[in-house]
From Swiss-Prot:
It comes from Mycobacterium tuberculosis (strain ATCC 25618 / H37Rv). Pfam families: Fer4_15. Interacts with the cytochrome P450 143 with high affinity (Kd=84 nM). Binds 1 [3Fe-4S] cluster per subunit. Ferredoxin that is the redox partner of cytochrome CYP143, a cytochrome P450 encoded by an adjacent gene. InterPro entries: Fe-S_cluster_ET (IPR051269). This is Ferredoxin FdxE. [3Fe-4S] cluster binds at C10, V11, Q15, C16, C54. It comes from the Bacteria. Its cofactor is [3Fe-4S] cluster. Gene3D superfamilies: 3.30.70.20. GO terms for molecular function: 3 iron, 4 sulfur cluster binding; metal ion binding. Keywords: 3Fe-4S, Electron transport, Iron, Iron-sulfur, Metal-binding, Transport.
């Protein structure tokens, strides 16, 4: 599973950051600075929770067939 950010949709609610600041870093304005990456197995549920928390749907999960 990969997670990525659509920066044009992020307006700085920081709801993802509230789920887990280490998984969802933000800048000084509250906007996500998440870099696209493969999600570690131990982070899958928190990543799903952070993506679901975004009211602007700026975070995108790309599920692998095996997930």
């Amino acid at each position: 599973m990969k997670v990525r950010l659509d920066p044009s949709r992020c307006v700085g609610h920081a709801q993802c950051y509230a789920v887990d600041p280490d998984l969802f870093p933000i800048d000084d304005s509250g906007n996500s600075i998440l870099a696209e990456h493969e999600v570690r197995p131990e982070d899958m549920q928190l990543t799903r929770d952070g993506v679901a928390a975004c009211p602007e749907m700026a975070l995108i999960l790309e599920e692998d067939d095996a997930d």
